Each structure stands twice: as C-alpha cells, then as structure tokens.
Amino acid sequence: MSVLDEIIDGVRADLAERQARVSLDELKERAAKARPAKDGVAALRGDGVKVICEVKRSSPSKGALAAIADPAGLAADYEAGGAAVISVLTEERRFGGSLADLDSVRARVDIPVLRKDFIVTSYQLWEARAHGADLVLLIVAALEQPALESLIERAESIGLTPLVEVHDEDEVERAVDAGAKVIGVNARNLKTLEVDRGTFERVAPEIPAHIVKVAESGVRGPHDLIAYANEGADAVLVGESLVTGRDPKTAVSDLVAAGEHPALRHGRS
C-alpha cells in the first residue's frame, strides 16, 4: 500500500465520523449562509507570479514542522505580505490540520482561501464551502477519472475553484480532459514522498496555455520562484519554508516582490 493509499484510508475513516455527526442537508444549509466564494482563477491570473501561502503543521515526509497555535494570525501575516491565496491543511492524521483551522483563517483574512485535503466525495466539497473555502484541492492520483470529472463539476457548481494536482504527464492529460482550469504540479510524488525538482519543467509544457499553472513543493525563497516562473509557472505554493522560518510576513513579501519583477510580467488577459 502506498503512502497516498494509507492517507486516504484515514481520510475516509475520519470522514465517516463527520458524516455521522453532520448531515449533508445541514452542510448545504451552512454553505448557503456562507459568504459568496471568491474567484480563485482570477486571484491566480494576471501579471507576474502569484504566491499561495500555506498553514501547515506537519507532513508525512518531514513530521512535525511548526506548532502554529494561531493559524489565523499566521494567515494574516501572509496576507499582509502580499499573498494571493491562503492554503489551509484540514487533514488531521498526517498534516495536523482541521476544519477549525479553516474557520479561523476564513474569519481573519479577506483574500481567497484554499481547503487542502484529500477530497474523495462531494460531501467534502460542501464541507469546504460551509467552512468558507473558495478553492479546493483535487488530487488526480487519488481519484478515478469519473470521480475527478464529477468532483470538478460539483465544486464549480457550488462556487469552488478546483486546484487539480498532478505529478506527471499522464495526470495532466486526465486533468485537462476533466475540465480543470487550475492545475498544480507537485514535485513530491505522494505515493513515494520523493521530490523531483525537475517535475514542473518536464510537465508544464503539456498544460494548455489557458489553464493556470501552479508549481507546488520546493520553493525555499525568491530564487526558486524565479526558476519556476522561467519554466512557465503562473503561481507557486509555499508551505514548509514559511512555517519553519522566523519571519513569515517578510518571507512572503520577498517572494511577492520577486514574482512582481518586470522580467516576470507574463500575465494573460
């Protein structure tokens, strides 16, 4: 069994407990009362390279990263530094996240918020919307094609922007066929946890120009952002280097400044 399979088994077990506590109808009622979702595609398009900043306590590959007693405060620092989107881990067993983290971040910041989890059912999409998310992660490797297509369609129908994660060229083809408008290329293989920094450079050319391209994993500073930008990235997702650093606001500001450099102003209308 791969690491991804183990994570999803845990996700399904935790999901069953939440479904027993909160009905789908109740979630839909909460979602209807949530403030309208912000446009995730619009947040990631435009001149330069946008920065998605992550609230992340731990990971399967590195273990504990940061305690993050105040996720809302961290998110506020990210926003003040110029982040375009805040990513919030809500998977509990391996990443130490929760829907409570999503609630607190949503209440604190005005920019779009991404629920980052292992989504396998539409119930989780309604959860995301009920807790104020504007974007949601869908991992191609975790889903059969009919499920991927259905989840993208359902997410968009309730206002969520799917960030569809891929790891190789075959998964890009699946994501494009499923109608993805934003594709994230993760340099970390979730089945083995190995990182290949060349993944984005190899995979990005297969992504059509009209789709927003996000580089995930391996961003430690402005030099990495610039490298990804030169390979065609419209945005980067940054987590570990921010939560383990001493001054996340300044670190984000430095990344944003690099992304706004005139040499990188390759935005599309």
Curated annotation (Swiss-Prot):
Pathway: Amino-acid biosynthesis; L-tryptophan biosynthesis; L-tryptophan from chorismate: step 4/5. InterPro entries: Aldolase_TIM, Indole-3-glycerol_P_synth, Indole-3-glycerol_P_synth_dom, Indole-3-GlycerolPSynthase_CS, RibuloseP-bd_barrel. GO terms for biological process: L-tryptophan biosynthetic process. GO terms for molecular function: indole-3-glycerol-phosphate synthase activity; phosphoribosylanthranilate isomerase activity. Its EC number is 4.1.1.48. Keywords: Amino-acid biosynthesis, Aromatic amino acid biosynthesis, Decarboxylase, Lyase, Tryptophan biosynthesis. It catalyses: 1-(2-carboxyphenylamino)-1-deoxy-D-ribulose 5-phosphate + H(+) = (1S,2R)-1-C-(indol-3-yl)glycerol 3-phosphate + CO2 + H2O. It comes from the Bacteria. Belongs to the TrpC family. This is Indole-3-glycerol phosphate synthase 1. The gene is trpC1.
